[in-house]
């Protein structure tokens, strides 16, 4: 039986934010001035922060703007906690990073940037649809594309281990550049195939990995597994539907899959995937290519065996998390004109291209034209083609945790880590599947009540 609640109740329960607060009118000039404080994501890829700061400072010098940049790590939910503190206090950075659902969560304190987006799209072309879904709140753009940080969470696996212990040639299924995929091989890569491979790899001491603590990376891999099985927590109408056969089925599956992982996954933070692959024990994780990037420096013998590829197919399709990252302007900024000019600047192809070269393709552009003609994913190695399949190239559907719930509710599903907490309770916490579902339903009802 499915539990139902109206969309209106969900929106009422999760909208604990007031009316939008607009900054004082400003006069846009051809030459920005003043000072901008920026809080941006502390990038995983070595050298990225320094390269980004050079680009920002160069723009500042050319436009008479003093730029101050703070790089804020995602570990420990520091990005979200800092945003919450600044939003409540009405003081902090001028420009702040807003990933995934944060434009929805902080829409009441974010300056509208419709004019910025209009200029960027007029110059650069359209963004991926998911960007509008996340950053355009109630018809108003609240954030603009970040030049760094947008990413997908496909799989990254060890070619040698899959061949040796699971008899699977991942390069044959998901080949590199200038090679055509075999649709039959791709179709056969489903969640049953992953489970069978994971069991063999685990028995050989090389299990797959996926965090199950209350961390972003945990939601990023669990949510697509749910989606592929047609399992939803809240549907597109805002009704709580966690009490379903589809959810029971996916929890039964995950109870088996988790046994192919190390017990430490329940304590992993957002660096856990990297550590697992660089240790030499890991055979697969669900992650951007940061393990490969770091391994090139710290464990090159493992890096040369790593390969990015698609997630498995489930009964309801193949899904992958696409994690857009935006920059927004707090409405308490005292230099909104300069902040908007800077957002326009970093929304250009030249800036995106430069940063993609620095990150060796870790960042996936939100503007479609910025990915076209960029050969960074084809050129990167070793091995040649290692990250070619990191951008979505096949039949995967890009989603974000909480999909397909209305954005206000989906934002809370992500913030409350309901996906990994539910899986953890069932696979390690002693709850039966029915007990876990009842817990999740209660949590979702509490979110609705605000």
Please describe what each predicted stretch is:
Residues 115-127, 171-187, 231-251, 297-301, ...:
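Short, solvent-exposed loop/beta-turn-alpha elements that line the ligand-binding surface or hinge
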Residues 191-202, 236-267, 311:
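Glycine-centered hinge/linker elements that transmit conformational signals in sensory
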Residues 94-97, 283-288:
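Paired acidic/hydrophobic, glycine-rich loop segments that form the ligand-binding mouth/hinge
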Residues 71-82, 188-193, 265-278:
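Short helix-initiation/N-cap motifs at beta->coil->alpha
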Residues 99-154, 303-312, 383-394:
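Hinge/lid segment of periplasmic solute-binding proteins
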Residues 61-73, 91-92, 171-185, 236-239, ...:
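A local structural motif
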């Amino acid at each position: 039986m499915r539990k139902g609640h109206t969309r209106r109740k969900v929106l009422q329960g999760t909208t604990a934010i007031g009316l939008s607060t607009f900054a004082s009118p400003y006069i846009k000039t051809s030459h920005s001035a003043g000072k901008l404080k920026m809080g941006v994501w502390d990038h995983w890829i070595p050298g990225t922060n320094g390269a980004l700061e050079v680009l920002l400072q160069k723009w500042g010098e050319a436009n008479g703007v003093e730029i101050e940049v703070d790089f804020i790590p995602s570990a420990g939910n520091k990005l979200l906690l800092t945003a919450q503190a600044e939003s409540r206090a009405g003081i902090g950075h001028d420009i702040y990073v807003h990933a995934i659902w944060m434009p929805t969560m902080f829409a009441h304190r974010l300056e509208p940037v419709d004019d910025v987006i209009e200029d960027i799209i007029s110059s650069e072309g359209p963004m991926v649809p998911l960007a509008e879904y996340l950053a355009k709140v109630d018809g108003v753009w609240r954030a603009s594309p970040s030049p760094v940080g947008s990413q997908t969470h496909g799989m990254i696996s060890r070619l040698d281990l899959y061949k040796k212990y699971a008899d699977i040639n991942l390069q044959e299924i998901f080949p590199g550049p200038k090679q055509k995929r075999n649709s039959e091989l791709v179709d056969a890569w489903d969640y049953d195939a992953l489970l069978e491979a994971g069991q063999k790899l685990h028995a050989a001491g090389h299990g797959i990995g996926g965090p199950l603590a209350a961390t972003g990376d945990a939601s990023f891999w669990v949510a697509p597994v749910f989606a592929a099985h047609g399992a939803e927590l809240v549907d597109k109408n805002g009704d709580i539907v966690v009490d379903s056969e589809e959810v029971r089925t996916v929890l039964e599956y995950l109870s088996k899959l988790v046994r192919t992982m190390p017990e430490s996954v329940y304590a992993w933070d957002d660096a856990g995937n990297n550590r697992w692959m660089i240790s030499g024990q890991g055979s697969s994780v669900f992650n951007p290519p940061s393990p490969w990037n770091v391994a090139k420096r710290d464990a090159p013998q493992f890096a040369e065996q790593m390969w990015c590829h698609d997630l498995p197919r489930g009964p309801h399709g193949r899904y992958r998390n696409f994690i857009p990252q935006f920059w927004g302007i707090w409405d308490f900024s005292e230099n909104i004109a300069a902040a908007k000019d800077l957002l326009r600047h970093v929304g250009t192809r030249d800036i995106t291209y430069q940063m993609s070269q620095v990150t060796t393709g870790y960042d996936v552009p939100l503007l479609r034209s910025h990915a076209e003609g960029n050969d960074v994913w084809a050129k990167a190695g070793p091995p040649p083609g290692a990250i070619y399949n990191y951008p979505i190239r096949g039949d995967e559907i890009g989603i974000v945790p909480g999909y397909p719930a209305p954005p206000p509710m989906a934002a809370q599903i992500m913030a409350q880590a309901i996906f990994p907490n539910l899986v953890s309770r069932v696979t390690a916490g002693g709850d039966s599947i029915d007990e876990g579902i009842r817990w999740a339903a209660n949590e979702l009802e509490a979110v609705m009540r605000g």
